[in-house]
Amino acid sequence: MTEEERIFRGELFASEEPELVEKKRRAHRLSQKYNETFEDDAEVREAILRELLGELGEGVCMLGPVRFHYGCHTRVGNHCFMNFNFTVQDDALVTIGDHCNFGPNVTIVTPMHPMLPDERRGMVCDDGVERFLCYAKPVTIGHDCWFGANVVVCPGVTIGENCVIGAGSVVTCLLYTSPSPRD
């Protein structure tokens, strides 16, 4: 089983395995390339995002800088807006619905360190090298959500549709769909 398969099964994985390191380096290079491209060069920026992300909807606007851990584990819906310093540690899958807006400095995190002391210590992997292991839990964000500045979304969180997350919030658990005024 590959380390990436372990991630998606919710098992401990070694984030420094060569297969994962190369995917992260690719994402970091593409994130940097995006950040070095001017906002008025929309076609180039969109092409970079399409290469970087697992899925990218239509009409997405991301102001730089952006940072993605893997990129390929992130799916972004249609007509989303991400303000400055949008950071996604997408070890596990991150799914963002349509018409979502993110204020500056929003961070979405999927990796988490083990809670048990024995698991936090370095473990010898199949190749005989001692590595530190971690888990990752997916994050799912429904359609029509709005995130204020400096929001942190923690591993394993599901946010329903039409939710408003106030500035400075740390989201640690399920947020149910909020009724829409159109309903």
Q: What residues fall within each predicted segment?
A:
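Terminal amphipathic alpha-helical/low-complexity segments used for targeting or macromolecular assembly
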Residues: 1-59, 115-118, 182
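Residue-level recognition of short, solvent-exposed, well-ordered loop/turn junctions
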Residues: 8, 140-142, 176
